[in-house]
């Protein structure tokens, strides 16, 4: 989700989820910063599942001799609840943009010492000063992208650029649709599908989307996270998911397609933060 304007009502398709070298190198520098606090030569990274490039960790371990232990989560709420409860002993976390202010307000993440992050100045200008973290005082960019719908074209050959894929599945997909457990994205897609705006406080609109989701849920197969593999292996024929993850599924199975709902869809950015007790 990008700052105070978390949605896109597109006229044309954007690019797939982007893994920008500058962002990854900056994230690696934050790993290095956190490692300075690791007296035992270990670093605990708490990140979304199936999201961390193993090559990045291998490179970091080879260059520093510090072992990275990766623990994953499946939603922003899961990550926040676990850290807030005091569990895990993690050093780094990767919250989405709209959750960063919550982490900061709760005192769960540190203000960054920019003198130890020389490449901080190399962050692309559009990401350097953002509404959810002014001046990038607490985070550095990790990745950004969009949330949409993935469909296996062997199961369904109709229009996939619509949230009807999960809000009102066609007969071919009834009982074959997965929905990600990241409820911010699901609510954003659903609100725009019924004619509302993401982050609305309109009670009647929220009731409308609640009723629409409850009506749709019996037609779903699951609410699960690991769709990169499951879409690639035909275990699931359609899913609400993220464009980068589905692109990886498509590398294994070219029948997997990604749709950008014409009703609107969320854009997001995930950023790396150093936990207060790291």
Task: List PLM regions with ranges.
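Extracytoplasmic ligand-binding site segments that recognize negatively charged/polar headgroups
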Residues: 89, 94-235
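Early extracytoplasmic/lumenal segment of secretory-pathway proteins
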Residues: 40-102
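Solvent-exposed loop/turn segments at secondary-structure junctions
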Residues: 50-52, 76-78, 98-102, 146-147, ...
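Periplasmic-binding protein-like
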Residues: 122, 206-214, 250-276
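Gram-negative bacterial Sec-dependent N-terminal signal peptides
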Residues: 20-39
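General small-molecule cofactor/ligand-binding pocket signal
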Residues: 69-71, 178, 221-222, 257-259
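Short, Lys/Arg-enriched N-terminal segments with co-localized hydrophobic residues
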Residues: 1-19
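A ligand-binding cleft/hinge motif common to bilobed small-molecule-binding domains
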Residues: 99-102, 232, 237-255
């Amino acid at each position: 989700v990008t700052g105070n304007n978390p949605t896109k009502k597109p006229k044309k398709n954007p690019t797939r989820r982007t893994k920008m070298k500058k962002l990854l190198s900056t994230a690696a520098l934050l790993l290095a910063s956190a490692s300075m606090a690791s007296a035992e030569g270990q670093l605990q990274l708490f990140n979304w599942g199936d999201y961390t490039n193993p090559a990045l960790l291998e490179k970091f371990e080879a260059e520093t001799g510090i072992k990275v232990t990766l623990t994953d989560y499946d939603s922003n709420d899961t990550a926040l609840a676990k850290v807030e409860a005091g569990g895990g002993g993690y050093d780094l976390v990767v919250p989405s943009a709209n959750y960063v202010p919550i982490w900061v307000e709760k005192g769960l993440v540190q203000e960054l010492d920019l003198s130890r992050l020389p490449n901080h100045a190399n962050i692309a200008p559009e990401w350097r000063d953002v509404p959810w973290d002014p001046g990038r005082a607490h985070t550095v960019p990790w990745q950004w992208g969009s949330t949409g719908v993935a469909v296996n074209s062997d199961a369904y050959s109709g229009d996939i650029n619509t949230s009807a894929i999960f809000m009102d599945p066609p007969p071919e997909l009834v009982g074959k649709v997965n929905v990600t457990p990241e409820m911010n994205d699901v609510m954003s897609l659903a609100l725009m599908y019924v004619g509302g705006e993401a982050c609305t406080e309109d009670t009647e609109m929220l009731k409308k989307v609640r009723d629409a989701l409850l009506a749709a849920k019996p037609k779903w197969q699951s609410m699960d996270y690991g769709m990169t593999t499951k879409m690639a292996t035909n275990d699931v024929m359609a899913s609400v998911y993220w464009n980068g993850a589905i692109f990886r599924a498509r590398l294994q199975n070219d029948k997997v397609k990604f749709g950008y709902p014409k009703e609107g869809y969320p854009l997001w950015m995930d950023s790396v933060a150093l936990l207060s007790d790291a």
